[in-house]
Amino acid sequence: MKFLKKLGPVRTVRMAQVWGMGLSATLPALVSTGAWAQASATAEEGQTLAPVVVTGNPLGGNELIAPTEQVGGAELRQRSQSTLGETLNGLPGVSSTYFGPNASRPVIRGLDGDRIAVLNNGAANTDLSSLSYDHAMTMDPLLIERVEVLRGPGVLEYGGSAVGGVVNVIDGRIQREALFDDQGGITGKVDAGYATGNKEQSGAVVLDGGTNRYNLHVDAMSRRTDDVSVPKDLSCTKGGVTTTSRTLCNSASDTQSGAIAGSVFFDRGYLGASLSTYESNYGTVAEDEVTIKMRSNKLALEGELRDLQGPFQSVKAQYGQTDYQHTEFEAGVAGTVFNTRGQDLRVQARQVRWGQLDGVMGLQFDDSDFSAVGTEAYAPSSKTLQRAAYAHEEYATTWGKLSAGARVESVKVDSYGVAGVARFVPGSRSFTPTSYALGSLWNVATEWQMTANLSANERAPKHYELYANGEHVATNVEEIGNANLDLERSVNVDWGLAWKRGAHNARVQLFQHQFSNYISLEGTDLSATPPQYTYTQVQARFVGFEASGNARLLQGHDTVDWNWRADQVQADNTSTGQPLPRIAPYRVGSTLRWGRGAWNTRVGVDYYGAQNRVPDGQLATGGYTLWSAGMSLTSKLGGYSALWYARLDNATDTLAYSASSILTQTVPGKVPLPGRSLKVGLQLQF
């Protein structure tokens, strides 16, 4: 942790410094090469080559057993929102925690929080977004190169707790392979956008340059929004004055982020580093005058040695260190201050192939310190230490492949209490979670493929599940931890069938998660003000399906495609027979796409069913239909490759509420989904 003290001065880095440092480091090297044409060709090729999925794919294969979704390039620009959760919302099996337009995490198969692993370039992403729904994530879609979503629990390299799946955000800051030849070059992109619904003004710049021996990277982004428009009149009280308008009160935001990074390449590997900063000031929407000012600074180191002698052919290491803080303000007055500092190290070795057997094994170390000081602190200061060892093996067969994985962890959670606050009691708990996974892939016939996964997972309770004791304003309840919680255990089954013929494809996934002691926040005194809830272990079951496909309706000078998608999850507390809360309803969607040369257009519709399966005392959510449309054009502009794009969201300005948002229950009617909005943008690449 000593290095954190050295990292401390980075807190004062502003966007101007990020730009200045990055450009001063990069431009001299780039200009000296004079190889702009080479960079332009590389950038264009990068658009056409589909990258190999890296998440949960340590062996670099083209066929994955775990159900996987990848979003990048023009598709990512078309669906990009201000949060990662809303950007991915609508993918098969993926919903969001929607806490207004500024704070939203992905929900996979009805599971959220720490049951979803959110990674940055395959390494841990440290923030406090899983602690509370009003805490934003420290990454912005404007600087994302692509996102990989793995559904299901079998990816044990990233933790046995990720029962729902893994979301890996790839930003390309540390390059693992050279982008240029020995003559060198420069490549980059500039993105600018505007949206009518929240008056969003956004922009981003990404630059890479170097030779076949090194790469330098700099990026920066800015996004400013006003209160988002909604399809109904809402009241807003600020400074004692109440007004009414068709906007969501206290939903404005101001966000900046940037990074400088570099990689050095040698004959048998690479070594890279990046330094990034993220700052955001946004309204929390649940309360009219509460805002959060956040900043996060991160150092990342990464390297790999290849072509080794002995039992391993390569060794890869990743190290990250994060210093995160946010302050909650009420009517401009600083209140509770949340801090977390963490560092993580992963070392992974790939074994020499033994016949048809290939695999990796690794070690992972995670340390994090948490503190919250102020009147709204509901969890004490704590420290979490985690050590883990894991292995993943694959055996190739004539008909497909088999996989097996195992992970064992040592987790220690210490509560230090808070000086002068009697309700926070010091304590210490230790756990040894173990998880196992089996998978198989069959090429059952030409164009047909079947997958199956079975896993047994264990998750150690988080510090707030053990030691929380106080009012949680974001959820409007008093949260009481349970220091006697045991490991959360689950048995998980996943089965999939996929078909592909040219541009036609279809797939379906069936899954079930069976928990013997699911950690749930259960009401223990609902008559209190605020209601009292305690973390309790119950039996629970999640069962559901995901399906999607594409049909090429017209092939020729024009192409017409019909995409379809559907999903549903049913989650129950089987100890009480009650449904579990905040589960998305069944969804059915369809998109018609037309393409001609550089032009692409689409019209889509998504139907969200009513969610009547809610626990006693909670509100049902009505069904609704959302229409959308989009258009893009690729062209040349001043010698650069240009992508012009436009997207119309909620075209009919439909009033709708999210069943997976806590706000639908805690402040009924106050936070509808955004209304009609048109976003236009331009991305230049060179």
Positions of predicted regions on the chain:
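N-terminal Sec signal peptide and the immediately downstream disordered periplasmic leader
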Residues: 1-93, 117, 177, 208, ...
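Gram-negative outer-membrane beta-barrel transporters
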Residues: 43, 357-359, 398-402, 505-507, ...
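Acidic, small-polar-rich N-terminal luminal/periplasmic segments of exported/outer-membrane proteins
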Residues: 45-179, 458, 495
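Outer-membrane beta-barrel signature, preferentially recognizing the C-terminal barrel domain
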Residues: 182, 289-308, 338-340, 426-439, ...
